[in-house]
Amino acid sequence: MSSRVLTPDVVGIDALVHDHQTVLAKAEGGVVAVFANNAPAFYAVTPARLAELLALEEKLARPGSDVALDDQLYQEPQAAPVAVPMGKFAMYPDWQPDADFIRLAALWGVALREPVTTEELTSFIAYWQAEGKVFHHVQWQQKLARSLQIGRASNGGLPKRDVNTVSEPDSQIPPGFRG
């Protein structure tokens, strides 16, 4: 088990029990790490150092300014969970896979490196809306995972590139060619 010791002064528990006043008097900064069975057990702190630490904690607990900020500025509203229809249903335009879709896909044997893009999801929904078939939510997610697996297989498992972007030539010479 790894651990971090927060003081350079280390002593065994037996030495602390034998003469705690001398050990604490020699401690740099008023703190000693006490070890038992070669592992840190606790810290021994002098009363003066404890008073300093408590005063520091109290000072940090008080606001540094008298300006109070409105909590509403920092609290973002929770996203309302989308209700998934019970039982079988036909594909609809606002359908979304679960938030942990990539993990679920891995459980189904489909390793997805990238999350579903909006283009991929829109294409999937449009296709299955036209088909008019009905499946359970989990079955729709499995179909989406397989669809992504097949669609991305031709591109090394990544989403397809945008056909409207201008490609940049690379300047590397393939092995076996002279440049």
UniProtKB/Swiss-Prot annotation:
Residues 155-179 are annotated as: Disordered. It comes from the Bacteria. InterPro entries: DnaT (IPR020917), DnaT_DNA_bind (IPR040480). One of its GO terms (cellular component) is primosome complex. Involved in the restart of stalled replication forks, which reloads the replicative helicase on sites other than the origin of replication. Can function in multiple replication restart pathways. Displaces ssDNA from a PriB-ssDNA complex. Probably forms a spiral filament on ssDNA. Belongs to the DnaT family. HAMAP family: DnaT. Homooligomerizes. Interacts with PriB. Component of the replication restart primosome. Primosome assembly occurs via a 'hand-off' mechanism. PriA binds to replication forks, subsequently PriB then DnaT bind; DnaT then displaces ssDNA to generate the helicase loading substrate. This is Replication restart protein DnaT. It comes from Escherichia coli O9:H4 (strain HS). The lineage of its organism: Bacteria, Pseudomonadati, Pseudomonadota, Gammaproteobacteria, Enterobacterales.
